[in-house]
Curated annotation (Swiss-Prot):
Protein name as it appears in the record: Type VI secretion amidase effector 2 protein
Pathway: Cell wall degradation; peptidoglycan degradation
Protein role: Toxic component of a contact-dependent interbacterial competition system (also called effector-immunity systems). Secreted by the SPI-6 type VI secretion system, probably into the periplasm of bacterial target cells. A cell wall amidase with specificity toward the D-meso-DAP-D-alanine bond (D-meso-diaminopimelic-D-alanine) found in peptidoglycan of Gram-negative bacteria. Toxicity is counteracted by a cognate immunity protein Tai2 (t2585), but not immunity proteins associated with a similar endopeptidase in other bacteria.
Primary location recorded for the protein, binned into one broad class: host cell
Enzyme Commission number, as recorded: 3.4.-.-
Length: 133
């Protein structure tokens, strides 16, 4: 069952939240999703026409959220087109993104999956996102 925060669009230009301004802290601040280590990989996001605005999405490796300091990401889904997905997120160290804001994540054109099943540039690869369950 997906987690959905109905007011995700209203977060545009709000202050970052959490002690470290991590992406997961944004999700946990607005909706009860538990610890990221308990998250389960659901359906793929890119190309899925049945995702509700505000659905929690994240990058996964072998069905689990990696929970590393960098290289993985979580966000609220806002929409998509043929080139990528729109999300509402926060980035801890991005000075160009000082507040919670909308971001477009493109589908990579040079192949997106490695031979071990991990995704190239996961945080910036539309095909690497899945619904959190």
């Amino acid at each position: 069952m997906p987690y959905v925060y109905a007011n995700a669009k209203a977060l545009q230009d709000t202050e970052k939240v959490g002690n470290h301004h991590q992406c997961v802290e944004l999700i946990q601040h607005y909706i009860r999703v538990g610890q990221a280590s308990t998250w389960q990989q659901g359906a793929a996001v890119f190309g899925n026409k049945n995702i509700e605005v505000g659905t929690v999405i994240a990058t996964f490796v072998n069905g689990r959220y990696p929970n590393h300091n960098s290289g993985n990401h979580a966000a609220f889904f806002l929409g998509q087109d043929t080139g990528g997905i729109w999300v509402m997120d926060q980035w801890k160290d991005d000075i160009a993104k000082p507040r919670v804001s909308k971001r477009y994540i493109r589908k990579l054109h040079n192949g997106s999956v490695r031979s071990d099943g991990t995704y190239i540039r996961m945080s910036n690869n539309a095909e690497a996102y899945f619904i959190v369950e």
